[in-house]
């Protein structure tokens, strides 16, 4: 299938990456000042039947689309713009490790989030390859000759310092250099990305999220860690019983679950941003066994059951606790709300930037 991704935002979300990643992406502000209006998306290689002029290509899983990935995309966009060419990214869905490992892998971003973030980076064409055990048997030689050269007519390839692909991960940097000489395309290898002396990697970000260290995760992601989903009907006790109504989300098996407890949040609903607090856990006060994410949205009174929301996790407040009853729980939530509002007030500029969302004009 071929999709067209259109962006109608006012540009503030592009400033977020420039704001957080300016030390590692010195040209980022210039690139992001004129974001593309659309990105073409292919989910079937057979649908690619056009020639891409000056194809500058990168390949990766790009889970989280963190600052290291953004550095990679910036290089692709820079090279493509310089020659009037096309910036192309190739990625995979599901994540290869979800197919190849029995235990799978927990993902920082959904495929939907990944598409949005790659489009925001300025990429012109995104190829999403369905990853299967059959595709895993594809040799590196075949991948280069058939897809990169045969289908995309690659003119330049940009990869990360540790990238490898193909059966047995034989398509490493040395292999790609040899293939570039054979097929006459230059290879650019982007160095590892460090922020405050720490290597930026999806593995590290997953660890930080599991530990509830959202400030540290935000530095490496270049934005707040976000969960999203459709609001579910819960136990209906948040408003009537406790006095704090909640919008409830459920986790999928492949989702990365943050440390259980209470977080300060920003909630994006129907194009508007609100402050809030989020509890992730099992509701021990009421003896429940289902893992849920319950968000109380400040100064919000709409019925949003069945509607999508996005929740940015700003700061971990406290671990999940079992209280003596609803009154004790309500008293603690009241204290959580006061503290959360103060934290959001102290971060007002950052909150404004982080909550800027694409919207239909």
Predicted stretch roles:
Residues 2, 13-15, 21-25, 30-32:
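Short terminal hydrophobic/aromatic SLiMs and anchors at protein ends
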Residues 234-361:
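Phosphate/ribose-recognition catalytic cores of enzymes acting on nucleotide-derived substrates
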Residues 66, 118, 157, 217, ...:
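Residue-level signal for inorganic ion chemistry
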Residues 105-115, 138-144:
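Glycine-rich, highly charged phosphate/nucleotide-binding loops
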Residues 137-244, 320, 324-328, 341, ...:
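Classical nucleotidyltransferase
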């Amino acid at each position: 299938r071929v999709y067209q991704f259109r962006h109608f935002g006012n540009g503030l979300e592009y400033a977020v990456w420039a704001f957080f990643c300016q030390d590692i992406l010195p040209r980022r502000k210039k690139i992001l000042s004129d974001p593309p209006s659309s990105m073409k998306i292919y989910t079937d290689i057979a649908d690619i039947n056009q020639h891409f002029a000056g194809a500058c290509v990168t390949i990766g899983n790009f889970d989280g689309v963190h600052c290291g990935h953004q550095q990679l995309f910036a290089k692709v966009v820079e090279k493509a713009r310089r020659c009037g060419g096309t910036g192309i990214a190739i990625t995979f869905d599901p994540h290869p490790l979800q197919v190849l490992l029995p235990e799978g892998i927990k993902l920082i971003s959904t495929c939907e989030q990944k598409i949005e973030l790659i489009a925001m980076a300025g990429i012109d064409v995104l190829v999403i390859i369905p990853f299967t055990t059959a595709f895993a048997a594809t040799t590196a030689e075949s991948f280069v000759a058939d897809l990169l050269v045969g289908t995309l007519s690659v003119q330049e390839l940009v990869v990360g310092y540790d990238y490898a692909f193909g059966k047995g991960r034989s398509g490493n940097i040395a292999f790609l250099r040899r293939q570039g000489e054979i097929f006459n395309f230059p290879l650019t290898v982007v160095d590892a990305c460090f922020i405050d002396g720490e290597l930026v990697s999806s593995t590290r970000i997953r660890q930080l999220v599991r530990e509830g260290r959202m400030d540290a995760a935000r530095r490496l992601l270049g934005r707040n860690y976000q969960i999203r989903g459709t609001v579910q009907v819960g136990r209906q006790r948040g408003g009537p019983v406790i006095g704090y109504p909640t919008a409830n989300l459920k986790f999928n098996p492949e989702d990365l679950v943050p440390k259980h407890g209470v977080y300060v949040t920003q909630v994006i609903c129907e194009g508007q941003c609100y402050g809030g607090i989020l509890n992730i856990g099992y509701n021990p006060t009421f003896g429940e066994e289902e893992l849920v994410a319950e968000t109380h949205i400040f100064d919000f009174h709409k019925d949003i059951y069945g509607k999508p929301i996005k929740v940015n996790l700003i700061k971990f407040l406290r671990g999940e606790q079992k209280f003596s009853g609803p009154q004790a729980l309500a008293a603690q939530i009241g204290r959580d709300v006061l503290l959360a509002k103060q934290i959001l007030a102290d971060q007002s500029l950052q909150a404004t930037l982080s909550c800027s969302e694409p919207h239909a004009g």
